[in-house]
Every structure is written in C-alpha cells, then in structure tokens.
Amino acid sequence: MINLDDKNNIGRVIPVSDIVLLPGMYHTLKFNKFSETQIESLSDEDIVNIALPLKQNFGQSKLKEEDFHRVGVTFQVNAIEKTEKGYKAEIKILDRVEIKTFSIEEDSIKAEFEFAPDIIDLTEKSKDEMVEYIKKVTREISENFKGSEKFMLAVEGQKDLNKLMGYLSHFMQISSEEKYDLLETQSLKDRGLKFIDYLLKQKESLKLQFELAEKFTEKANKNYRETVLREQLKAIQEELNEGKSSPSKKDKNYLNRIEEAQMPDEIKEVALEELGKLESQSPNSAEYNVIKNYLELLIQLPWKKQEFKDIDLEEARRILDEQHYGLEKVKDRIIQHLAVMQLKNDKKGSILLLVGPPGVGKTSLGKSIAEALNRKYVRLSLGGVRDEAEIRGHRRTYVGAMPGRIIQSIKKAGEINPVMVLDEVDKLMASYNGDPASALLEVLDPEQNDTFTDHYLDVPYDLSNVFFIATANSLDTIPRPLLDRMEVIQISSYTMNEKFHIGKNHLISAVLEEHGLNDTQLVIEDAALERIISEYTLEAGVRGLKKQIATIARIASEKIVSNKVELPFKVKEDDLEDLLGRKVSSHDKAQDDNVPGVVTGLAWTSVGGEILFIEATGMLGSGQIVLTGQLGDVMKESAQISLSLLKSRLPINAINFRERDIHIHVPSGSVPKDGPSAGIALFTALASLVTGIKVDSKLAMTGEITLRGAVLPIGGLKEKLLGAQRAGITKVLIPKDNVVDLNEVPQEVKEQLTIIAVETVEDVLRETLGISLPRIEHIFNPNKFIEGTFKPAEE
C-alpha cells in the first residue's frame, strides 16, 4: 500500500475528463461529490493533488487503474466556493507528472509519481512567435462570430504559450484523446505544433460550415446535398451491414494499378484502405484530392525489387576514361568499389562522398557511374536547404503537403535502385524548421534506410538499393555523424596539362555543339588554349575555362553570321586580348632575385595551390615582433615559434633582440591566411634576415616546425607542388613524412621540380642558406659560439 504520509512522489488523484491542463494555467474544477472534509483537505499543503485525465467519462461506475491515463498535473488550490450542487475550486497548475503505481481505496485514489517537466526546446523568440501566430489564427476565426470582442480581450492578454493553449482548448471542438495528447507531449515545440494543427483544422472546419450554411440558406446546393446524402447512405449501409456497392469503372482501374504496382502486402493494405476512403468522398471535396494524390504516389512509386546485375568493370573503366581525362587515382577507387560490390553480389546501395574544389567533375562522375552500372540517374541539389521537410516531406495534415525530395526523386527515376547524387551536401543549413543534415542520417545509414519513412508517405520505403553519391567542396562543414556514414574520395585540382587535354578533347567540342558551330568554322590553336588556361582562368577545375571558350564561341558566331571573317575562324594566342580582354589570372610568379629576409612559401586554397612570399625586416625598437598580412592565430604562433627557435639555435649574440623590432609581412593583405605549414618558411626568412644570406628565388618550401626543430607533415601537397610548378619554381623543400604523398603528384610535375625532403631545421638551413647549426647542447653556453660567425655547412 502507498503511504500518503510519505511526501516523496506520493499524491492524491483527482479524476478529470475532457479538459486540457498544462503547467502555468489557472482553471476552475467542480467537486459535486466531495464532502466538506475532503474539500478542506484540498488546501492541505502537505498533500500533493494530482489532476489525472480519464480515458472516458465513466459516470457513477467505480474507477479502476486502467481507466486512467498515465500523465497528469499537480495543482494548488487558490480558492474554494460552495455552490448549489457542491463546490468549485480555483486552481493553479504546477507541474507535469507521470504516474508509476496506483492505490485505489473506497474514498480516495493515491498514486506514486515522478516529475516529467516540459522539454523547453524553443527559444523565447520562437515561443513569442508561436503565441502571436496562434492569436492571429484565433482572430481570423473570431471574425465570423458576433460579440467575440470580450473573448479576444482574454486571448490577447495571454502571454504564456501553455496558458494560451489551455484557455483556447475549452472553446475548440477537439476530442478528449487529442486534448490528452497535448498534455502527454513533453516537448513544448511539438505540443505547440500539434495545437496549431488542431487550430488550423478548426478554422477550416468552421470556414466550411459557414460556407455551406450560407449556400444552403440561399439555395439547396447540389454538392452539399450530395455530400450529406453520401454520408447518410454510408451510415445506412454500415447499419444494415450491406458493405460497399460494386466498384465503379474508375475504382476497378485503381484496383488493377494497385495489383500491377507489386507492393508489399502491408503497403497494399494501406493503398486499398485509401481507395475505400476515396470511394466515400465527393469528387468536389478537398479531402478527395488529398486522398487521390496520396494514392497516386503509392501506385507510381517503384516497389519491385531489382535483381543484382553483374558489373562489367572493363566497360565501367571505358566510360570513366571516355568522359573524364586524368583523375586516375579517383577512377581506380571507383572501379575498386564496384569490384567489391560485384564480389559480394551486393544489392544494397553504396554511399560515396566525392570531395574537391568546384569544377573538377564531381557531379559528372556520378552521372558516369550511373551509366557504367546501367542504372537511372537522379540528382538533388542540397545547397542552401534549411528545412527538414525537404528531406522527409510534410505531414499530410498540412495544406499543400508533398513528399520529400528523396521520395520524389525515386518516383522520377521509376526504379528502386537508381544512382542518386546528393550535390553540395556540405552546404546544408540548420534552422528553426529543423536540421536537414540530421534528417539525412537515416537516409544514408545502411542499417536504417531499408525502412525509411517519409512524413507524407507515412509507410516504410526501402532505400537500401539506392547507390548514393554525395558531393562537397569541403569536409569542414559536414557533421561528423553524417561523414561517418560515407566513404570519402578526395578529388584534387587539375594540372595545367590535364586542363589542356580536357579543353582540347572535351570542352571545345562541347561548346561548339552548344553554339551550333563545328570544327570547320572555329579553331582554337593549342598555344591560345594554353594561354587561356594560364592567364584567363583562376580555378582548380575547368568550369571557368569552359566559360572563356564559350565567350570566344559567341563572338565567333556573330562574326560568322555577319560574314565578317573567312572560315575557319582561327583563334591565335595574340587574338586573346581582343576577344577576352585583359587577363584575369593573378597567380604569383617566382622572382628573378631575392633580398635577405624574403622566402617563398607554398599555400593551398580552394582554387588550387599558390606560392606565398614571406618578407621579414628588422629595425631599432624594443624587442617586439610585428605580424601583418591578415594572418590567422595558427600562423602567428608559427612566427613566434620560429623566432624562439632562431634565438635559441643560431649563434647571433652580436644582435640584441631587446633593442630590435622584427616585422614579418605576407603580401596580398586583403586575403586571410592561416595554418601551420608556413613554419619552415617563416623560420628561414628570419634566419636569412639575421645572417644577411639570400635564399634562392626559385626555391619554395612548406612544412610545420616545432620548438625542437623538427619539421612536421602538412596537407595539400599535390596542390602546392602544382602551384609551385605553375609559378616557375624549380626546387621545393617538403617534410620527410610527406614523401609518401608524392605518389599522388603527376609525373610531369615531379619531373620539372627538384623535390628535397627535410626532417629538421638543420636540413632546411643547409639547403637554403648553406649553413649548419651548432649542436643542441651548446644552446645555453654562448661562450661556445663565435660571435657573428657561422660554421659552413658540411658537403
């Protein structure tokens, strides 16, 4: 038995029915069967009162545990008033609770409970917006009723979301179950959305009632009478147990289509149920079109399982080679992935993530994979999508609801196993409408997506047969749980030679066809094409190159149509300034000569690799280090490490750093720069400054340094070496741990560069300044140093 004297989680249950009680509300309860003693005990602060909803109104019958719902609210009594039939009490709702056990006695019901407070998943701003929206809809409803001004004054005075919902629920025609559903919903956001849904249904219902009443008063509306008669006929048939009449020709057509769709049994059952609803509706009713559209979606979706077809790897390789020049490592990865699918005889879809700069062929690779697999190809552009409903669809209760884009794409493909490209997945955005990236977790999880449930479809759909290919420019903005579900394939920027072959063998012919030209009318010479690539584009891919070729094609088209040129119209290198204007490329070039303190570093940007000049100079001052060029925190720390390492390792006692300022600048000051890979370049620039030894202007370097003088590996080596080769660099220092990454670098680039691996700053200074550092044990013994001199590097 429960001891009511135990004040921990024990309370007295007051049964209530057909009302909504939410925390923070004030309400009046009637107690027609309570004795005076029982009424007085309601105000006892030592007893917890719990208002607990009944599942239905049981009248005089004795209540049992199963008659109650499990979620209720505690309340305090503010005032009690005697009435003709009993008592009424003004109460304030305190907390939401969940009942664990009951103890039902002759004159009281007690229960053990635990608190289940609301989940506040709305910001104050969102709550205020939801309150204002509810008031707005209520105003629109009240305009149809005379004398509603007093009611609206009470509504406008409500500021709390729970209080407003509880107050309005007394005037709404919603079922007891729907009222209890509001209380049972713990999320404040979900409760508000459900209430708005009920309110909008109420609005539409009242609107229809007023319209029908008006039409019926003016004239016995045929459609209205038909609706009433249909409902009456349906009720009579159910009462007489006659069932439905024989199906019409239209219904037989739907039955045949449902059979032909080869749905799973549970889906077929849903479709037949919807068909039954459709038969009972008037074609002119709003519900008729909602049911019809849903039924059409069920029928048109592909349900039939596809047999796994053998993959012709040679044909797949041929298609990839034919449609994409270069990218050998990427194509190898794709072919290997297809080979694994073939060996496993795996019908389940795969999930690849192609990551790389814009214009390198990520989306078109997905199309080629679809062709290689002989599957349908569909593409979803997800850039800027911020509504979860775009992925999961809208619930059918909303006006204008539709399925999510995943289900729409499957319907468009007409097959259950298409290749689906999710483009720009890194540009999904979260908002108050939900997080689309989180919605994609179910779509891209092989353990879950065989029962993916779209909100509109509302039945499980098997996505496990779909071959998903996502594309992104960067991994940084992709949530980690989503990234874990995909196999990442990096696509690097193209080399100059690759761009030339792509332009010559693919882009020129494609652009000519788009502009109605052929190779007998327009010819772009090789030298001109090379110059377009080097001076009129600044990109990792070839999208800008295609635009420049298209510009030339448009100019040529105008000249050819006007008979202003002889055919073929040849574009030479010297013609480019007249056709394309001033060159737009701003790639830095290696300098012819350097001064002490200037070093060439290497950077990796979204459009490929670049060289980066680092300049250092000294002056009289107070020992400060000045850093300019819009450097990030990591790069500033690299400069501090370089200076500390310089002071500790070089024999420079002749320089008093307390009386000298050092200024380090990285040109292109409007461009933000960050990262640790400029460490050895910063160190070398400072060493060059204090020793007065120049660094070869054709030498560039990249690598992170530590206070121990170690050179650590960096990222983006391929792009950096491509940028060095393009800028005219002939010698590059890289970290020793990055030597393995040279396998990713095209052979043509490696042949034009002398690449030297370095492991410590001693190696760096030996290659750049031709000096060696003293042994590390001499660092704190300046007497061992020869002031102002350096030991030449050993051969």
UniProtKB/Swiss-Prot annotation:
ATP-dependent serine protease that mediates the selective degradation of mutant and abnormal proteins as well as certain short-lived regulatory proteins. Required for cellular homeostasis and for survival from DNA damage and developmental changes induced by stress. Degrades polypeptides processively to yield small peptide fragments that are 5 to 10 amino acids long. Binds to DNA in a double-stranded, site-specific manner. This is Lon protease. Residues 593-771 form the Lon proteolytic domain. Belongs to the peptidase S16 family. Homohexamer. Organized in a ring with a central cavity. Keywords: ATP-binding, Cytoplasm, Hydrolase, Nucleotide-binding, Protease, Serine protease, Stress response. It is found in: Cytoplasm.
